[in-house]
Each structure stands twice: as C-alpha cells, then as structure tokens.
Amino acid sequence: MSDDATFEKFRACTVEVLQVPEDKVVLEARFGDDLDADSLDLVELVMALEESFDITVEETELEDVTTIGQAFDLISSKL
C-alpha cells in the first residue's frame, strides 16, 4: 500500500472515530488543540486503527504522540 493510500485509510478511520471533518485531519493537526480529542477518544482511535491495519500499538508508544503526523508515522512504522 502506498503512503498516500495508507494515509487515506488512516484519515477515514480518524474521521469516523473522532467525528471531525476530513479537511481537519492533516499531518500538523494536534489531537487536543485542533481536533478536540481527549484521551478516551485517542484510545478509541488507536483501537480502530489497530483493527483497520491489523497491527498492535503498545500504550507506551503513544506517550509522545500529539499530532496526526506522529500517529501516522507510528502506524506506518508497523506496516
């Protein structure tokens, strides 16, 4: 899967779980400040991404993830 296709799948999952407009899901967007996502939203998103991409993300890997770009990089590194 190309990076573009991977990001589109990532974006679709994020839009569905966080209930945000697609145009807000950009690499620079911060979960808390730009997308109004709290920690429960992020747990839900990670669970959905794990299922969608058939991967496992450890809780400790999420500690420094604050932006869409960081989350996408983490997911991409597991593919």
Task: Give a label for each model feature.
Residues M1-D23, S76-L79:
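Thiotemplate assembly-line natural product biosynthesis machinery
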Residues E8, D23, V43, T66-G69:
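Residues in well-ordered alpha-helical elements
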Residues V17-D36, S52-D64:
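Phosphopantetheine carrier-protein modules
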Residues D33-E51, Q70:
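Phosphopantetheine-attachment site and its flanking helix in carrier
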Residues I68-S76:
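Short, cationic-aromatic polyanion-contact patches
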